[in-house]
Curated annotation (Swiss-Prot):
The lineage of its organism: Eukaryota, Viridiplantae, Streptophyta, Embryophyta, Tracheophyta. PROSITE patterns: RAB (PS51419). It comes from Glycine max. Belongs to the small GTPase superfamily. Rab family. One of its GO terms (molecular function) is GTPase activity. GTP binds at residues 15-22, 63-67, 125-128. The modification Cysteine methyl ester is found at C206. It is found in: Cell membrane. Keywords: Cell membrane, GTP-binding, Lipoprotein, Membrane, Methylation, Nucleotide-binding, Prenylation, Protein transport, Transport. This is Ras-related protein Rab7.
């Protein structure tokens, strides 16, 4: 029997309350979207398995509260992260303006060995609202911010319409895999069928 490698990757999703962090995660993992908004209290996580090349990857995606009073919980949740996903609402300028704070807070609390090399990914969510007519943060403005942070990847997404969600999280998985802390578990003889068909590599390059 051959040995297959399964890797656990910890991904932290940050951003203001109401930008759609939970909705993006639910769309990616469960293929579900709800119009009802319920604020995340503290932090919670979901998992998703996928295959990248010869690696069986388990993404542990942490959904953290956007409210300021819960930010002190960050230390325990940020530590050991392999990738940080920053999310803002393209229709709310304040959610974009606070990205700098989220970025700095993560680096401060997570304290990665090389902050400049740690993988971040930016998602501009809710591009479906009002057919895009109500957006206030331009794509150029977002890309300029990413360029200033070392050319971090940027995706425009819609959790409601399931637009770019899979592509974004595949890029997230690849970035996290490149930064992994070698938390590998070996399983003997895991068949290909163990990875659900809809979670196979899509072929999208990050």
């Amino acid at each position: 029997m051959s040995l297959r490698r399964r890797t656990l990757l910890k991904v932290i999703v940050l951003g203001d309350s109401g930008v759609g962090k939970t909705s993006l995660m639910n769309q990616y993992v469960h293929k579900k979207f709800s119009q009802q908004y319920k604020a995340t209290i503290g932090a919670d996580f979901v998992t998703k398995e996928l295959q990248i090349d010869d690696r069986l990857v388990t993404l542990q995606i942490w959904d953290t509260a956007g409210q300021e009073r819960f930010q002190s919980l960050g230390v325990a949740f940020y530590r050991g992260a392999d990738c940080c996903v920053l999310v803002y609402d393209v229709n709310v300028m304040k959610s974009f303006d606070t990205l700098e704070n989220w970025h700095e807070e993560f680096l401060k609390q997570a304290n990665p060995p090389d902050p400049r090399a740690f993988p971040f990914i930016l998602l501009g969510n809710k591009i479906d609202i009002d057919g895009g007519n109500s957006r206030v943060v331009s794509e150029k403005k977002a890309k300029d911010w990413c360029a200033a942070k070392g050319n971090i990847p940027y995706f425009e997404t819609s959790a409601k319409e399931d637009y770019n969600v899979d592509a974004a999280f595949l890029c997230i998985a690849k970035a996290a895999l490149a930064n992994e802390h070698e938390q590998d578990i070996y399983f003997q003889g895991i068949p290909e069928a163990a990875v659900p068909e809809n979670e196979q590599r899509s072929g999208c390059a990050c």
